[in-house]
Amino acid sequence: MSEEKQTVEQNETEEQEIIEEQAAADEQQEETNESELLQNQINELQGLLEEKENKLLRVQADFENYKRRSRLEMEASQKYRSQNIVTDLLPALDSFERALQVEADNEQTKSLLQGMEMVHRQLVEALKKEGVEAIEAVGQEFDPNLHQAVMQAEDENYGSNIVVEEMQKGYKLKDRVIRPSMVKVNQ
């Protein structure tokens, strides 16, 4: 019986080893499945993180572009803030210049003209401080960006496409034309 008992014990031991091996294999399989599941979750979270980082970079770039655009618009607004009032003042300046061309024939008229010249100078200086300047025309080559041709002439003293006469002064505010010069151009 001892042999039988030994065989039974050996069988039980073998069964126990098989069960333990099976349990170890099952445990290892569970660990592998759990490891794969965790790795999949990590990969998914890394992809989500990368997507969010890219979105954040785009939002930051959009915000920087918005700030730059706002700054440029503000600078342009400051630069040309006086354009409307200057445009409204130009006809008055033209009238002043026409009035100053009248010849004074007595002391009262001369005195009045001197006063008007002082006011005219002050007005021109105030406009210069704002960046307004007259556009040079006579003797210059015709430039459609600066001049408006209203007449043509044939004058041998001037070359082709040269401004011969200025009918109305043109003005620029900083680098922007607010009124082109009305000119007569040589053919």
UniProtKB/Swiss-Prot annotation:
Disordered: annotated span: 1-38
Acidic residues: compositionally biased ranges: 11-34
PROSITE patterns hit by this protein: GRPE (PS01071)
Top-rank taxon: Bacteria
Consequence recorded when altering K5T: In strain: IS58
Keywords: Chaperone, Cytoplasm, Stress response
GO cellular component terms, A-Z: cytoplasm
Biological processes, Gene Ontology terms: protein folding
Principal localisation: cytoplasm
Record note on quaternary structure: Homodimer.
Family: Belongs to the GrpE family.
Protein name as catalogued: Protein GrpE
